[in-house]
Design a protein with these regions (language model features):
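N-terminal membrane-sensor/transducer module of prokaryotic signaling receptors
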Residues: 2-9, 20-188
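RNase H-like DDE/DDD metal-dependent nuclease/strand-transfer catalytic core used by mobile genetic elements
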Residues: 12
Length: 188
């Protein structure tokens, strides 16, 4: 009887997970990006902390290390734990290809090494440099807040993950930190 109970529990868990995957698969990238952006904006009432950012990036890297690209759907949509406190996790590789951006899905598959912020900083080149040299670290640049067009100062924590699909960089950023705090993170 215990075996039957365990089998039924496993069956229902697998059925739930399969259904969750089907729900995500049914949404087109545009719908999922809008849902992700709405979730990000809705969660902005809570301000992210430096510790919160690092914790989420570390958790993202653990997930990527285990599952590789198969984990990407877990980073998108209104129920993603990786969309939080007005921010989100994105993933790119060391060649500068955006692998997964939950809000700007049109960047997925694009080489972003040529992207510069308004100050002329090649932000993804800088992020990859930090990851290659240190494994993880902070980078500051100008980037629009979710739902806005104009860029604001953002500082992001990026970390290298060795996954079944190769090396990937997971990143997450925060806006509106005091300049002194940003300078401290950057080692200035």
């Amino acid at each position: 009887m215990r075996t039957m109970s365990k089998l039924l529990t496993i069956f229902f868990c697998l059925a739930f997970l399969a259904q969750t995957g089907v729900v995500l698969a049914d949404k087109n990238p545009e719908e999922l990006a809008k849902e992700s952006e709405s979730a990000c904006e809705a969660s902005a009432k809570t301000k992210p902390t430096i510790e919160m950012i690092k914790e989420k990036v570390d958790k993202a890297c653990e997930l990527l290390t285990k599952e590789g690209k198969a984990a990407f759907p877990k980073f998108k949509g209104k129920d993603s734990e990786f969309i939080f406190a007005g921010t989100y996790i994105w993933i790119h590789d060391l060649n500068g290809v955006m692998l997964m951006h939950p809000i700007k899905h049109k960047l997925d598959g694009q080489n972003v090494t040529g992207m510069k912020d308004t100050a002329g900083k090649f932000l993804f080149v800088e992020m990859n440099k930090v990851c290659k040299e240190k494994g993880a670290g902070w980078v500051d640049y100008m980037w629009p807040k979710p739902g806005e067009k104009e860029p604001s100062r953002k500082v992001s924590y990026v970390k290298l993950a060795k996954t079944p699909d190769g090396e990937m960089v997971a990143g997450c950023g925060v806006y509106d930190l005091p300049t002194a705090e940003v300078d401290k993170l950057l080692g200035k």
